[in-house]
Every structure is written in C-alpha cells, then in structure tokens.
C-alpha cells in the first residue's frame, strides 16, 4: 500500500510505501521547518544553519575559544547570537522572550549534516544585579532542521527585574 507524502501541498511529489512514510517525512525537504529565533515563520528545504545565514543576516557572530568562559556583550533586544568554536562548530544562543517578565537563554549546536553531530558541554552564565546565574549541560543538542517547534531541553531563566544589558553580561563556555 502506498500513499502520498503529507507535505504534498508544500511541493513533495513522492508516493511512498506506508511502512516508510514516517522515515520519509522526517527527512522530506518539503516539510515545513521551524526556527527558534523569535518572530520567525516556518520555512522549508534548507538546514537551520543555512536558513539563519540567509534569513537572519543581522544575527551577530562571536568567535570563542574552547573551555574558556567568553563574554558575548549582548544587546537587550538581541533575539539570538551565533557562536563559533574556532572552525570546529557553530552554535546558536537562543533568547526566548516569551517568558512573562523575563527571558530564557539556551544553546543548540547547528549542524548541516548528521555526521557533524558531536557532544559539546556548555555553560551559560549571566551576571545580574543580584549575583551570577548559570546553567550548564553535558550535551548540547545538535540540530540540522527543526520539524517541530523548538523546545529547549535546559535554559537559564533571567527575570527582567535583575537583567540590565549594561550590567548583565552574558558569558558562554563550550567544550
């Protein structure tokens, strides 16, 4: 038994065996993809990394050194920051402002190819008016394309009461 891809209305012309439908749709280039940057609309085709480079050209890049807590000097209205770990890897620090009276910071490893997947440890640190807030993880999620809305596995919540762009520098460590 065969059936058309669920993304036929987005341009996919494949007719696939029922038993292969899920596998096909997970990798279908016509599937709508989601971007974790606030205000983004679904897109199709490209990897998240390519999408960000083409559609979010104003997102700033910061180069960091492995195993070093690096300042990012983020503006108050900055929705994200691209971070490169030398020539090894590119990460996206996501700033989610949908949190009432605050923001949530999380990090993802952007990959163009599943072969690029590598485990990176991370630490996000924010110096606030009341002290230092931090979150760390032993595995940074690797993302090629997001076929569902982005949900951070772990994030650092910072209240607007303690956040000030001048007084609350954001630091990131990757290793």
Please describe what each predicted stretch is.
Residues 1-175:
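Signature of small Cys/His-rich zinc-finger-like modules used by ubiquitin/SUMO E3 ligases
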